[in-house]
Every structure is written in C-alpha cells, then in structure tokens.
Amino acid sequence: MKIEKTALTVAIALAMSSLSAHAEDAWVSTHTQAAMSPPASTQVLAASSTSATTTGNAYTLNMTGSPRIDGAAVTALEADHPLHVEVALKLRNPDALQTFLAGVTTPGSALFGKFLTPSQFTERFGPTQSQVDAVVAHLQQAGFTNIEVAPNRLLISADGTAGAATNGFRTSIKRFSANGREFFANDAPALVPASLGDSVNAVLGLQNVSVKHTLHHVYHPEDVTVPGPNVGTQAAAAVAAHHPQDFAAIYGGSSLPAATNTAVGIITWGSITQTVTDLNSFTSGAGLATVNSTITKVGSGTFANDPDSNGEWSLDSQDIVGIAGGVKQLIFYTSANGDSSSSGITDAGITASYNRAVTDNIAKLINVSLGEDETAAQQSGTQAADDAIFQQAVAQGQTFSIASGDAGVYQWSTDPTSGSPGYVANSAGTVKIDLTHYSVSEPASSPYVIQVGGTTLSTSGTTWSGETVWNEGLSAIAPSQGDNNQRLWATGGGVSLYEAAPSWQSSVSSSTKRVGPDLAFDAASSSGALIVVNGSTEQVGGTSLASPLFVGAFARIESAANNAIGFPASKFYQAFPTQTSLLHDVTSGNNGYQSHGYTAATGFDEATGFGSFDIGKLNTYAQANWVTGGGGGSTNAPPVANFSVATTGLVATFTDSSTDSDGSIASHAWTFGDGSTSTATSPSHTYSAAGTYSVAETVTDNAGATSTKTSSVTVSSSGGTGGGTVLQNGVAATGLSAAKNGQLKYTVAIPSGAKSLKIAISGGTGDADLYVKFGSAPTTSSYDCRPYVTGNTESCSFASPQTGTYYVLLNGYAAFSGVSLKATWTN
C-alpha cells in the first residue's frame, strides 16, 4: 500500500492550494513565536545610540529584559533576502521515550545500558517518512530549495528567501541595525497548515537577534572595576593558572589510564584550521600524543577564520585533551559562520551541529561552550528543537556537557553598546538593571544535558586545596574599543523558567523547574588555563573551561568502563547526596552582584551544584555500581554478526540480521572485497566487474564488543546494467530489477555545451523511484530531482545541464523488474 506516496500527493495538493489561494485551510502554531513585536507605546532604546525616546511605533525583542528598538529603524526585510532554515519535527511516542530514557540510565533496570543505535531510535521515536514527505512538499511549494532531511528525520534543512518564509510559515520578517550590525527578526509567529501541526516542532533561522555566544574569559585583571566578594579560600593555598595537563592531577585522575577508548565532540563554528594547529602545538609541548582530530562541516556556506572565537575552541580542545591525557578521537562539529566576525551565525546552524553529532553517534561526550538567553531560545523554538535532539543522545548513551554561562544570574542582560551579556552598570558604576531579576542560559537548562558551572580554584602545586564560587565582580567590557560599561563575570546558575524538573532532581530540590548547574569545575580567569591561541600562550577561564574539564575528566571514567555508563545525571543525583567523599563541595561565594544571586552552601546549591569530583574516587565508585556490580549489570555478551545477500547483475543488496543478546548493535562496518566500504546497516553495492568477492561485515555493540562475518558473493554482468554504471547518450539500460529498498546506481558524464538533458525510466513492473543529483551521489533525502510519480514512468529534465557528472539512483519503493533507464541530451 502506497502510504508514503499517497500522503505526499495529498500534501502537495494541499500545499499548492493553501499557498496560492490562502484559503480555507486552518493554520496552526509551532514552537517558533515572534522574535520581536510592536507594542502600542513605550520608552525605547534607539538602535543607533543609548538615548531613550517615546514612540508609538516601537518594537520589543521577545527575550528576558524586553530590549526595545526604535520603530523608525525597523523596515521590512527584502523578499529576496536569502535565508537558511532548519524545520524541526516532533518526536514520535514521547511518553514511551521518557520511559525508555528512565530505564536506560538507571542502574538495576532491565534496560540499563541497552543503548539504541541511531536507526533504532529513528524507527521507534523519529517522525515517519510520510510526515517528512508532507513537510518537504510544503517547503517545495513555498519556494525553498536544497532541501535535505537529517538521518533521524528530526531536522529538515532548506535554503530560501524571506518571501519563501512568508509563504511557507505565514510570518513576516523585519530588519534593523544596532551596535554596528545588521539584524533580522520575525515579528509574527511561524505557522504551518493544520495537516502539518502534529509534525512540525519549530522553524529555526527566522532571526539572528538572539544567537549562541562563546563563554570564555581572557585574563585581564586591569579591566576589573569592582572586585568580586572576598570569600577567601577553603585552604591556605595559591590561586594561579595551570597548564591543561595539570588538571588531571589536581582533580585526582592522573593514576587512571588516558581516555583512549572514548571519542569526544566539540560544537564550534567557522574555520578550525588554526585550532588544530594550536592543539598540536599544545600536545607536542605537553608530551602528549598527537590527537586524532576530525573537522566535520555542518551545512553549507562560508567557514571563515574568526580570531575572537579561536580562543574558545582552543580552550575547549586543549583542556579536554589535557585532563583526559588523550582521547580516541576529537571531532569538531563546525557550523558555517559567514565571515571573520561570525555574522552568519544563527541557532539553525548550531542546532544542526548538535544533530549531526547525534546522528553520527561516534562521540560519547560532546562539549558545548555556548549559550544564549533562555527566554529568547524558548520563543524561537530553539529550546524545543534542542531538547528533542538531546533526548536521542541520552537514548544512545551520549552525554552533552554545557557551560552554564559567564554572567552569573544576569544571563539576560545585554550591553547597550556591544551586546555582551552580563551588563550591570554604566561606565560610572551606576547600576542600570534590576539586580533581583535572574535568568539562566540555554541549552544549559535542558534536563537532557549535564550543566557545568564554575569555581575559583586554589591549589598547592598540582594538589587541589579548595574551590569557591567563581565571581570576579564587575569589569569594563571592552575598554580598548571604547566600551567602558561594566559587566559581571561569574558562574551561571539558577532555575529555568520553562524546563520541567527531571525526576532525578527531586533528591536535592523541591523546585518544579530544572535547577542547575549539576557540577562545577575551575572557571576563574585568575586560576584558569594556559593555552596556545594563534601560536601564543594566553591565560583563559570561563565556564568554557569548566565544561571541557568535566568532559575530559568523565572521558577517563567512560573509557575505563568501555563507554558503558552513558548519560550520568540520574546516577549523580542518586549517589552524590550520600557519597560526599567523591566530591569537592563548594560552600563559599555567590553568583550575583551586591549580595544578590545564589549562595553556595553545604551539599547541592544553585551556584555550583554538587561542586567538582575526584576523578579516581568516582571511577572506583562507577566501576562498582554503574558498570559491573551493585546493580550495574553483568559482563557484556558480544554481538553476533550475520547477513544475507541478493544479487542482480553487478548489484549486491545486503540485509543485516546481526543480533546482540544483552544490548544493541551500535555500528556496522562493511568491506566489499573491491576496496569499497560502507557503514550502512543494510547497504547495496554495485561492482564494476563480474566475479566472486569476499565480503565482511563487522558489528560493534553498545559496550564496544565486536563480531565479524565473512562470505563470498558472486556477481555477473547480466541483468541489464547497460555497460556497468555509466549511461551512454541515448542508450537504454534495460531489464533493471531490484528488491524493495534495493538500489541501482549510475552516472552520466555531460560534455561542455550539452543541452536538454533528460533522464527517464519506463516499463516493467513494481515501483522504482528515480533520484538525480549533480556532482555527488543522491540519497533518498538529498537530491536535485525526484519526480514523485507512482509506477515506473518518471523523468528528470534539465534545460541547461552543468558540465560534469550527474549521479542517478533507482530505489525500490517496492520490488521492481524489467525497468528501462535512459539518459539523452543534445550537443
């Protein structure tokens, strides 16, 4: 039964009707609300200055503090202004997912440690293909192009214009200038047709007024205007900077093996070339092995070198590797940033990077030293989209670690000159904000991540002596650039306005909302890290130091456990209230200004959570209680690799049937005997010549155990492949056949000056789907042309084809046979 194609046909018809006639269909809301709105009359902050005026045409930015923009500075964004959007879809079976997440993270549960693979998660909890097809059809009819569906179907990326966004989401987008930058923002919520209401979660990329910012703090004591509270130290010791590798000894982990079994990811933007160069300089100087580094670019656009952000990515990478002693692999997931000032950053790109780390499912720990005002993220739909992705990470045994923020309880307050967070006073020291108005940072407030706050660390050499709440008081924001307004540098922490309290939080708090941070590590710039940035040494702090320290520290513990622990929040909250010997409790200091904010106390508190932990002691506890004993599970049974194969001509279609009796299959690795490989679960492979090939499948389970099956596969040149995979002009490949979900692949080499390319299939029985893409192989979610026609009469036409190679895919929507494929063009 053609549910997918039928649903898609209906969706296209509905989309055409609603977009062309704006008629009768009801449109419904998503999680994406207006980023700015015009109140009737208010005191407003002029976009080009700090003076206030009264106007009835003022716009309010919908974030904490409600910043205001003079309406005279606001105009409509041009209809042809390019936009890149990420349409976030809703999870399926959310209640069942919550039950699974509770079980997979709780020692003693029958589900404990039985993590899902990405394909298993998508099958059980991802949107259906028919839902995806309907949304894709709607985007196409609205005018979006370059549409790509993420493997888990939670995100659909698309390129378009402001006009396409207006058509597709019944919103409008405005533009204005402030602080020397150009901004755009939707002043109406994003809507979708009612038929898509159960599918679409949010639409990201409709604004750039609130985006993620880095959370590192370069040591400049001369800029301090009002020192932080004098809380002393917990022991007579020094507050001094440390090399990243020193933190292993300071936090009790130097006796453990390095984290060489665990891959780690870092969310970044722009060019990472200089960061890797600096990382290699650090490891060489520290006597550590060169790191196996991978740069994974997410999305399209310009990946520019941003000198201001290089310090962030160097802080992340060098401190993770330093405290971990090395990692199996370090993956930089980097978003396009547009230019050297990263003006092209939106939440759409950052959320897509989170999702890529999850669908890759390689990194077991992912560091995010970024954040933004929680209210703005909730209004834009970013928070809802991020939470769905983080839930998949938990289900797969991955852990996102998020820096809590560097503006204390004033994450919401932005400097009127530069836009920096934490603004408290003007250059004269006059307080300009409500000091009792608190907020937290997103995505740190998510209940599906570990939120890491900051401390000021005291040591005697490389021996831990004490920690207090990180609070450096007020500093001039950017005196070298003429901005002498004053901001607070202090650890983020507090209570979410929107995220419900997770059940495991009840052991320490009666709040109905998510409370954080969970833990806290060194963050003060005065006790910060000495890292290599652009070839020189800098002393840097911030919760962007604290989060990488947790990631590297916990990577040692996960590595010792063969990555069997997974997301540790519920375990922390179950153990830490009573197992206090594992911890460095922080009992002095607060994270506000003039006695405001949250104050540290014995046990858990909103300033530093449980404090930091001793790596060695926690590893011993984890081995006894979370891995092999104390209800943590039994010895892992290895998986059993198995597969079957069907051949048609030179095409071999493999069906995986591997099993794992006490867990799940985490990854597949195929070798086809001709030098080709695949990591798909059940791949299809086209050989270039007839013969017998030795094919091997290696599967790895969720605990790292492996199994391999090897089998001989014979293919022949019969089966109508038309001269292998190359299609000749006007020569049909005939008698094509494949099983359901089987795939046949071809190429078409187009010479210079060619015109009127047509690629078509016809005849036969069953149902083959045609996909065509220039320059690279198409997939069922990434293509230049897909006709969406029932049966085997489909064609793709290109009036002015590009010179080069077009790639053709025939996919078995149902089993098909006797199909002909022909490419024709004129010279």
Swiss-Prot record:
Q: Would you tell me the Gene Ontology cellular component terms?
A: extracellular region
Any idea where the Peptidase S53 domain is? 241-625
Outcome (variant: D406A): Loses both auto-processing activity and proteolytic activity
Catalytic activity of the protein: Cleavage of casein
Q: Name one GO biological process term.
A: proteolysis
Query: Sorted alphabetically, which keywords does the UniProt record give?
Result: Calcium, Hydrolase, Metal-binding, Protease, Secreted, Serine protease, Signal, Zymogen
The protein here is known as Xanthomonalisin
Naturally occurring in which organism (per UniProt): Xanthomonas sp. (strain T-22)
